[in-house]
């Protein structure tokens, strides 16, 4: 096990800066904070002909370790604005920080003859830092603004003993092996191409199979819970999003509008405004509620290029999105119904909720949230009471609500201990009013329905990233793009029979492929293992002689099993049906 000590890592950042200053005396140090896992330091070499490579990290790290043995102390000194400016007069980044904090207390920390502008805190002396590792080099911008100077960033970690560092590095290697970007590339699931555009994913055939299988399953779940599927436009008029409030509260995430003829259109970032139009398409009665709608919609949301991360953060996404329009007295039933639907979907996908958050608004943030205190109090109390009445454990998270209402977030803990929101239930009293949605109540008068937003699995892109990380790419049979690979021992003698067997399997909707490449048998079997194909069948003279039998082996096993073709097909069909 390992534990990150913020004070220790902050001190290690100073050691990094000291080592850098020795090797690159003309550099300008920027900032060196701690982060969740370690530290980094940003700097400018001030020399276009000089660069830092991964090999340079070794000598820098060696110098840092040398400094730890010197038992240098970290000595605090409070300084005036004028003295701080004098000390750092040749460093524009430090001067920028000083100027920004001229009305606050300023301090520096000394270690021997070296010093840095810093608030602290630090360890007593450098000997407390027993284990250091510099991890990688990246680029950054001063103040995170692409209009400012481009800087170099070096990441590192520090621990109080070598065992913790070893454990962390082992964990880091495991993360790399589970990185959905690597697995997605190895299994040919998806790709990106700058010619298409940054953050715009291209689903390859194998990935599309997984997506379609998940969608088929989710469609079945939605059908069981009486949802009707709709299809709405990928574009929406700017007036649609002004009416919904997204333009005011979500504008930074909406792609720039385009004018076509006499309309101003935007790529839709949300489906909910479109679903209000489905509801308003006809007169509704209290007897016809609830109305339950679902859609697997393509959305576009702007993310900065620095925020794009594989399939986890993209600019185009496919969202599974459900909306319920109901009476006030139906809220509890519909929310519990949504709970059951989410639980069934997560169980089928092998996902387990770690904890539930009740995401509330921040009443002090008038810019982020719609300003209607009564609406917020009513909607939040409804969800809070429902969770308590049904003894559902939850945490309240202020400032995490949608701009239009509170939500229940289902948090999943991944094998790498990351907490990710997969499913949501959101209560909305705002949009029905903004779109003038009504129904005829029992008194033959108009009433406004309540809108409930439900995300069963979120986006398909993020879901696939989670599944790949959780399974290391070893997907269950029903999700595997290729379920069976058939390999002939001799391409010249066994090809006809192999093709016949492939046709037979495909008639039963089993996703089988034939490997007819002119390669060694051992190589084909090894590559089938690398591709994580659940079943491999090898066909030779003996199998053809007894043409009612097949010999197979499972992924990750050396054991072979011989069964009848009929039994093999029945076994696969049963596993697929049971989502195994």
Swiss-Prot record:
Its cofactor is Zn(2+). Pfam families: HGTP_anticodon, tRNA-synt_2b, tRNA_SAD. Signal peptide: none annotated. GO terms for molecular function: ATP binding; metal ion binding; threonine-tRNA ligase activity; tRNA binding. It catalyses: tRNA(Thr) + L-threonine + ATP = L-threonyl-tRNA(Thr) + AMP + diphosphate + H(+). PROSITE patterns: AA_TRNA_LIGASE_II. Its main location: cytoplasm. Binds 1 zinc ion per subunit. Residues 179-476 are annotated as: Catalytic. SMART domains: tRNA_SAD. InterPro entries: aa-tRNA-synt_IIb, aa-tRNA-synth_II, aa-tRNA-synth_II/BPL/LPL, Anticodon-bd, Anticodon-bd_dom_sf, Thr-tRNA-ligase_IIa, Thr/Ala-tRNA-synth_IIc_edit, ThrRS_anticodon. GO terms for biological process: threonyl-tRNA aminoacylation. Catalyzes the attachment of threonine to tRNA(Thr) in a two-step reaction: L-threonine is first activated by ATP to form Thr-AMP and then transferred to the acceptor end of tRNA(Thr). Also edits incorrectly charged L-seryl-tRNA(Thr). Homodimer. Belongs to the class-II aminoacyl-tRNA synthetase family. HAMAP family: Thr_tRNA_synth. This is Threonine--tRNA ligase.
């Amino acid at each position: 096990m390992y534990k990150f000590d913020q004070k220790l890592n902050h001190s290690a950042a100073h050691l990094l800066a000291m080592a850098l200053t020795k090797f690159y005396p003309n550099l300008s140090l920027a900032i060196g904070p701690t982060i969740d896992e370690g530290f980094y330091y940003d700097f400018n070499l001030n020399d276009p002909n000089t660069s830092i490579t991964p090999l340079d990290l070794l000598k820098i790290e060696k110098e840092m370790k040398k400094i730890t043995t010197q038992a240098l102390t970290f000595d605090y000194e409070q300084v005036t604005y004028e003295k701080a400016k004098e000390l750092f007069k040749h460093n524009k980044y430090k001067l920028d920080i000083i100027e920004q904090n001229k009305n606050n207390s300023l301090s520096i920390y000394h270690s021997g003859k070296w010093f840095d502008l810093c608030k602290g805190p630090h360890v007593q002396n450098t000997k407390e830092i027993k284990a250091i590792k510099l991890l990688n080099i990246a680029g950054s911008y001063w103040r995170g603004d692409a209009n400012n100077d481009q800087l170099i960033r070096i990441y590192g970690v520090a621990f109080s003993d070598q065992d913790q560092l070893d454990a962390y590095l082992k964990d880091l290697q495991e993360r790399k092996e589970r990185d959905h970007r690597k697995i997605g590339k190895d299994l040919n699931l998806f790709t990106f191409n700058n010619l298409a555009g940054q953050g715009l994913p291209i689903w390859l055939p194998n990935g599309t199979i997984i997506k379609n299988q998940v969608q088929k399953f989710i469609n079945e779940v939605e059908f069981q819970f009486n949802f009707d599927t709709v299809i709405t436009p990928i574009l929406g008029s700017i007036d649609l999003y002004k009416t919904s409030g997204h333009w005011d509260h979500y504008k930074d995430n909406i792609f720039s509008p385009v004018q076509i003829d006499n309309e101003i259109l935007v790529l839709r970032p949300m489906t909910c405004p479109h679903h209000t139009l489905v509801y308003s398409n006809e007169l509704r009665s209290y007897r016809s509620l609830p109305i339950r709608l679902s859609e697997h919609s393509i959305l576009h949301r702007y993310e900065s290029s620095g925020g794009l991360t594989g399939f986890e953060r993209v600019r185009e996404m496919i969202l599974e999105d459900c909306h319920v329009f109901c009476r006030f007295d139906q809220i509890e039933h519909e929310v519990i119904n949504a709970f059951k639907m989410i639980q069934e979907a997560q169980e089928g996908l092998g996902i387990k909720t770690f904890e539930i958050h009740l995401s509330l608004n921040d009443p002090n943030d008038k810019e982020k949230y719609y300003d209607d205190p009564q609406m917020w109090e009513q909607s939040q109390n409804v969800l809070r009471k429902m969770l308590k009445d049904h003894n559902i454990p939850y945490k309240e998270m202020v400032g995490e609500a949608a701009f239009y209402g509170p939500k229940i977030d289902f948090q999943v803990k991944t094998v790498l201990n990351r907490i990710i929101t997969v499913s949501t239930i959101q209560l909305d009293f705002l949009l029905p009013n903004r779109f003038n949605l009504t129904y005829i109540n029992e008194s033959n008068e108009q009433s406004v329905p309540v809108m409930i937003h439900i995300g069963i699995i979120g986006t398909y892109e993020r879901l696939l990233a989670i599944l790949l990380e959780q399974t290391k790419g070893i997907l269950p049979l029903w999700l595997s793009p290729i379920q069976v690979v058939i390999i002939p021992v001799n391409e010249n003698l066994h090809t006809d029979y192999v093709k016949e067997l492939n046709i037979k399997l495909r008639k039963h909707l089993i996703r089988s492929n034939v490997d007819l490449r002119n390669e060694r048998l051992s190589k084909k079997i090894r590559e089938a293992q690398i591709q994580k194909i659940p079943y491999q069948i090898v066909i030779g003279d003996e199998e053809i002689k007894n043409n009612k039998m097949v010999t197979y082996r499972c992924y990750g096993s050396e054991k072979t099993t011989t069964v009848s073709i009929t039994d093999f097909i029945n076994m696969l069909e049963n596993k697929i049906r049971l989502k195994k």
